[in-house]
């Protein structure tokens, strides 16, 4: 679940929470995955792998490659914790808004 207006790591940094269903109860899987900085809008797009072990998170407001260049981060679940897999996938230039849409393959 993406909450791109969350303020956990700064105003509008955003975050993502993943939930799993056990019986009739939804429980959070792992920790909150917070955006990097204010106005990243992380969680504006989210894609979960078919087995639930990877999540791609778009942050279209990230400034890693220029103002509003955006980026995507991929996280893997190990035990009950999410950790980043590889480096940030940054947009190419300012105002690219990379990460507006993300999608993982089924494998």
Where are these regions (language model features)?
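Conserved beta-strand/short-helix segments
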Residues: 1-107
């Amino acid at each position: 679940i993406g909450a791109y207006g969350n303020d956990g790591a700064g105003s509008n940094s955003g975050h993502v929470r993943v939930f799993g269903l056990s019986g009739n109860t939804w429980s959070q899987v792992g920790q909150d995955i917070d955006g990097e900085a204010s106005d990243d809008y992380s969680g504006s797009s989210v894609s979960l792998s078919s087995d639930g072990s990877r999540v791609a998170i778009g942050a279209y407001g990230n400034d890693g490659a220029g103002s509003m260049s955006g980026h995507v981060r991929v996280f893997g679940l190990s035990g009950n914790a999410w950790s980043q897999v590889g480096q940030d996938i940054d947009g190419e230039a300012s105002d690219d808004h990379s990460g507006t849409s993300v999608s993982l393959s089924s494998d």
